[in-house]
């Protein structure tokens, strides 16, 4: 049993939304709706309270899009090529402690997050804050590795300008201009099905960003899922 539990730590997405996890996808309706919506909309926002697996769900989707490993029940966006994407949080520290942690695992325990250990080809340290990664390369079945670029909102627009991405994940509410610039990074890959996801707990109520997301949802092809 101990050997199984130790091996299970490195099983990536297989740790989640399964019978063995205690939370099979059949009882996680809103999470399933969130995943499914990525196949129909270019922007999908998952509004949820704290401790409701919104960040876990964001990391799960990113793992699928970078490794090409999809569960049988997956009804969301699929890519059939190596992908490049932005994974961003509010600050360098929060990106390290949430987004990076969910994808890679704790510092010193990389491979225990959503990206399976055997799929991690390279992690490039950023320097500051300590333990933060600049990017990681992920093995898939298409040849060239996928690339995850770790960014933060406090880096301003220069951090993401000029990039061409297949997907983007914003964890928590971004500054509106940062969000627009990230979305613009998806235009060159639109024909491949590029998609942006935003996982957020609306601690400050209906801010201008959240209201504008609702207002433009029909125009931009967006969806909101709330838990």
Language model regions located:
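Phosphate/NTP-binding elements of NTP-utilizing enzymes
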Residues: 1-227
């Amino acid at each position: 049993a101990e050997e199984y539990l130790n091996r299970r730590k490195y099983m990536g997405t297989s740790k989640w939304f399964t019978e063995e996890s205690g939370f099979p996808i059949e009882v996680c309706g809103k999470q399933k709706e969130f995943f499914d919506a990525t196949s129909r909309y270019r922007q999908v926002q998952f509004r949820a309270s704290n401790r409701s697996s919104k960040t876990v769900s964001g990391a799960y989707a990113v793992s699928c899009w970078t490794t090409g490993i999809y569960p049988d029940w997956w009804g969301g966006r699929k890519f059939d090529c190596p992908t490049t994407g932005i994974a961003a949080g509010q600050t360098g520290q929060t990106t390290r402690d949430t987004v990076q942690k969910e994808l890679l695992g704790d510092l010193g325990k990389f491979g225990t997050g959503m990206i399976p250990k055997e799929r991690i080809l390279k992690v490039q340290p950023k320097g500051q804050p300590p333990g933060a990664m600049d990017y990681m390369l992920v093995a898939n079945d298409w040849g060239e590795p996928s690339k995850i670029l770790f960014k933060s909102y406090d880096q301003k627009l220069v951090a993401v300008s000029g990039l061409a991405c297949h997907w983007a994940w914003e964890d928590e509410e971004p500054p509106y201009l940062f969000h627009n610039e990230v979305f613009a990074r998806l235009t060159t890959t639109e024909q491949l099905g590029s998609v942006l996801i935003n996982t957020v707990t609306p601690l400050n109520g209906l801010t201008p960003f959240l209201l504008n997301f609702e207002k433009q949802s029909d125009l931009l092809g967006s969806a909101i899922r709330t838990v």
